[in-house]
A protein has these predicted regions:
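A nucleotide- and high-energy phosphate-metabolite-utilizing enzyme signature
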Residues: 1-491
Length: 492
């Protein structure tokens, strides 16, 4: 991390561009070497953020105030970090996003501060995104544009008039809470658009670790929506308020750290921004992270297996969190109530799905066999399991394997499901919540496992489940291929 001596050296060199550039390069190299030794994603981006803060504040003291003061109450202008930099997650090749916030009566001060800082930053080689805004501008632009609103949501004071910045925080926070449902709809549409562009599955052969499904952006959406809808400023705060389970917080924290290490190393190695895990990068990163080849399993396959497992958990946690934010419409609640009927005393079957009503949640969680019964009822009724019930099943299983799952009766009930139509969908849902690998521990080794070539589109677990579903489709189909399959099946 940046030491007081580092900060003093940067401040002393702030009037000498060549010397300052050399100090920054030396400090970045020290951060890179620490990253290579310890592979700590969170610590590395925090160190890069702290370095940028120190550089900017040294320049501010030199070119704006010619003194030591950072907080200048009444000056009418504040320098604010926004976006990823404001969030405190500055990767090696990230842009620097700044907002120069000014009071309407101090526009001249705002222009002078922005000019005084931007030119030295450009001379140092930084790519700086910047804006000059009043509080009113922030509210109006944030209202019209969800991307601007998101960047402002992550604002962080750096220097200047802190009182002005705090007034912005209050006004923007009030507007954010008032318009949280609109923001939710905007961000969900944006999220789907990102999936359409960067890949609708976690299991891409060459995923974008930031924007593909299961990438860092999924984590950002949880943070953004948690902030907008609940005012929570961290994953820990979401968990403390019961909006994330302990296992979900653990999955998100692990994803942030591991993906942070990978992205940091990609930026350092390339010397520029780039987030696509190409085949060549997969091999290099596997070696960097210490994944060695084993008999019948390459190091790169082990690395990508961890990536797919982690990104799947990240994406599924994000999906569950977003479902908690979405309220069913009145019409939806009415139609569900009209068509609902109880089955097995715990479950409710509607025309759309099998669910667990709120009044039965405690009974469901207290019964170790309830999760398997849920899937058996859904298969027998020819309905999918409701997303809320899948979330509940995932929660019930999050404590780890239960001895009940290894009991002969459990195994018998499980394999009995294979004799009924719909087993393909049932197995896929079981896999989503983690039940399949608890009933069949051998299946866990197939989870997220990808063969390292361009010919296998899916991981071993997904490929296996799709093969079962294909067999189900053939068994119930009417085409020539289905007919041949049914004739052959009759003679097995």
């Amino acid at each position: 991390m940046l030491t007081p001596a580092d900060g003093e050296a940067l401040a002393a060199a702030s009037g000498d561009p060549a010397r300052l550039r050399a100090l920054i390069a030396a400090r970045r190299e020290a951060i890179r070497l620490e990253h290579a030794r310890h592979r700590c994603g969170g610590e590395t981006v925090a160190a890069l953020t702290a370095l940028m803060d120190a550089v900017l504040r040294a320049l501010y003291r030199r070119v704006v105030v010619a003194g030591d003061a950072l907080d200048r109450p009444g000056s009418g202008c504040a320098v604010v970090a926004v976006g990823g930099y404001g969030r405190g997650e500055l990767f090696p090749a990230s842009d620097i996003d700044l907002m120069f916030l000014y009071d309407p009566a101090a526009r001249g001060e705002g222009l002078a501060v922005s000019k005084g800082l931007l030119h030295p930053l450009w001379d140092l080689g930084y790519t700086v995104g910047h804006s000059l805004r009043r509080i009113r501008d922030c509210l109006e632009l944030g209202h019209r544009d969800a991307t601007i609103r998101t960047a402002l949501m992550e604002a962080r004071w750096l220097a200047g008039d802190r009182t002005l910045y705090e007034a912005f925080e209050r006004a923007f926070g009030a507007r954010l809470r008032k318009e949280s449902r609109v923001y939710l709809a905007q961000k969900l549409a944006e999220r789907q658009g990102g999936y359409d562009r960067y890949g609708s599955t976690v299991y891409l052969l060459e995923p974008d670790i930031k924007k593909s499904k299961g990438g860092l952006r999924d984590l950002h959406y949880v943070s953004w929506l948690g902030r907008a809808c609940y005012g929570a400023k961290s994953l820990d705060e979401l968990a403390d308020r019961g909006l994330l389970t302990a296992s979900e917080r653990r999955d998100l924290t692990e994803a942030r750290e591991v993906l942070g290490v990978i992205r940091t190393e990609m930026h350092f190695h390339a010397g520029k921004a780039g987030d696509v895990l190409t085949f060549d990068e997969q091999v290099r990163l596997a070696r960097f992270l210490g994944y060695e080849d084993r008999p019948h399993l390459l190091g790169v396959e082990r690395f990508m297996q961890q990536y797919y497992r982690l990104s799947t958990a990240l994406h599924q946690t994000g999906e569950r969190f977003i479902r908690r934010l979405q309220r069913p419409t009145v019409w939806r609640r009415l139609t569900t109530a009209v068509t609902a009927r109880e089955v097995e005393t715990v479950f409710v079957v509607t025309r759309d799905a099998v669910s667990v009503p709120d009044r039965r949640r405690a009974a469901f969680l207290a019964d170790p066999g309830a999760v398997l019964t849920l899937f058996a009822v859904a298969q027998a009724q020819g309905r999918p399991v409701a997303e809320s019930a899948l979330d509940l099943a995932h929660h019930a299983l999050s404590g780890g394997p239960s001895p009940w799952l290894a009991a002969p009766e459990t195994q018998r009930r499980f394999f009995h499901l294979f004799a009924s139509p719909g087993i393909g969908r049932t197995l896929e849902m079981m896999h989503r919540v983690g039940l399949l690998e608890q009933i069949l521990p051998e299946f866990a080794s197939a989870k997220g496992l990808m063969q390292f070539n361009q010919y296998h589109k899916y991981t071993v677990d997904v490929h296996s489940l799709r093969a079962v579903q294909a067999a189900c489709d053939l068994a119930g189909g009417s085409g020539r291929l289905a007919g041949a399959y049914q004739i052959g099946r009759a003679h097995v």
